[in-house]
């Protein structure tokens, strides 16, 4: 315990000393709490994430940061034509991890993200792309095995999103095709959560998709056919379909969603059904959020199993620019075996001092019944253009 507290103190000192610029990609915590009912109000993507719209940049500049400023591209120094949108994200991270082993704790300071964003729009059609470097805390040791569906060379350049879309209006029908995450779940920014990591939405697991849907302030629906990324050899080898329907309630301060996904590969198949919910309690500046999924796992060559992946938490937004989020999680590989569950608790403190900048501190502990707890501390410093 003292060792982990030492990590916390040391990391806080490093945070105060460094204060490198930062920002985050997409926060589902800002749905309802910021006045936006749809993620696509702030992002060009129909499901949120990626480049910000003019509405989203105005919100960053005037409402979501501690001190107001210009959320425009390049802080308003460069005015882009209407058909062209650009962006960039830079993130550096300090990671400390302690799994109880004799050589613990371990720590690393590494570049976590360096991405460029591009959007070309022509009437109702657009091309969108995100490209950059794969984050890596340490250099890989040893050769990559054949058939592992991992990049087999040291080239760390990757495009995690690129797609063409047809969307005549910010509300109504849309179609898009390319590489991106199928709309599903809470879409937390943290890829380590079980509802992302263990359901096919981990870091760099974007699939190639044909997706369509319909967006309204009161509701939205998305249907996606997906296949593996054979171009860059990243992600999973699953192919299948996913659907997501969300309904806004209580004067658009709450949302309830139902979702299904079927995925199949040589390793087997899995059918997922789940519910997602959010409720913003304005007088308390509190957003409750949760997701629960039951998975029917059908591995090749062995008996099927019922699994569970869930998350429940809350975000407290006391003043402009400050967001405190806590949540608990569980992933059970077999609901018939009480020892199969892994539980986790996470706390995130995010500060948006000025448009384009964010500082975040993350503390996480996770443990199974049969093993020691794994404690992780992550400090992120992120800037977006």
Task: Go through the PLM ranges and name each one.
Residues 68-72, 84, 112-116, 157-162, ...:
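Hydrophobic, lipid-facing positions within transmembrane beta-strands of outer-membrane proteins
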Residues 88-90, 129, 175-177, 212, ...:
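Membrane-embedded beta-strand positions of outer-membrane beta-barrel proteins
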Residues 36-46:
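The canonical Cys-X-X-Cys-His
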Residues 38, 358, 373-385:
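Outer-membrane beta-barrel "beta-signal"
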Residues 80-88, 123-125, 171-173, 217-221, ...:
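Outer-envelope beta-barrel architecture signal
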Residues 47-52, 82-96, 104-230, 237-239, ...:
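Outer membrane beta-barrel
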Residues 238-334:
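Detector for outer-membrane/organellar transmembrane beta-barrel domains
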């Amino acid at each position: 315990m003292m060792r982990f507290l030492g990590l916390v103190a040391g990391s806080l000192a490093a945070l105060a000393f460094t204060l490198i610029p930062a920002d985050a990609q997409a926060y589902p915590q800002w749905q309802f709490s910021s006045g936006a009912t749809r993620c696509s109000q702030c992002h060009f993507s129909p499901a949120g994430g990626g480049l910000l719209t003019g509405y989203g940049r105005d919100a960053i500049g005037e409402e979501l940061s501690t001190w107001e400023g210009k959320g425009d591209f390049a802080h308003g120094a460069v005015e882009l034509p209407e058909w062209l949108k650009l962006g960039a994200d830079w993130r550096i991270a300090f990671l400390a991890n302690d799994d109880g082993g004799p050589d613990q704790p371990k720590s690393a300071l590494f570049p976590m993200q360096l991405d460029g964003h591009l959007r070309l729009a022509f009437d109702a059609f657009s091309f969108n792309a995100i490209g950059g470097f794969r984050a890596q805390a340490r250099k890989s040791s040893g050769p990559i095995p054949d058939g592992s569906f991992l990049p087999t060379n040291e080239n760390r350049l990757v495009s995690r999103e690129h797609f063409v879309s047809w969307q005549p209006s910010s509300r109504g029908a849309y179609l898009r095709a390319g590489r991106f995450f199928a709309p599903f779940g809470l879409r937390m920014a943290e890829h380590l959560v079980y509802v992302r990591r263990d359901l096919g939405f981990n870091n760099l697991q974007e699939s190639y998709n044909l997706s369509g849907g319909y967006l309204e302030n009161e509701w939205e629906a998305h249907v996606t056919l997906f296949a593996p990324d054979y171009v860059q050899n990243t992600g999973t080898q699953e192919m299948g379909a996913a659907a997501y329907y969300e309904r806004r309630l209580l004067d658009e301060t709450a949302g309830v969603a139902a979702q299904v996904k079927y995925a199949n590969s040589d390793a087997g198949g899995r059918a997922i059904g789940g519910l997602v919910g959010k409720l913003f309690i304005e007088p308390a500046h509190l957003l409750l959020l949760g997701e629960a999924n039951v998975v029917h796992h059908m591995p090749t060559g062995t008996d099927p199993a019922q699994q569970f992946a869930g998350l429940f938490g809350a975000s407290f937004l006391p003043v402009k620019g400050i967001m405190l989020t806590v949540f608990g999680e569980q992933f059970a590989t077999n609901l018939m075996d009480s020892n199969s569950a892994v539980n986790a608790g996470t706390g995130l403190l995010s500060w948006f001092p000025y448009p384009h900048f964010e500082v975040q501190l993350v503390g996480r502990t996770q443990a199974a019944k049969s093993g020691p707890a794994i404690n992780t501390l992550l400090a992120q410093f992120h800037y977006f253009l």
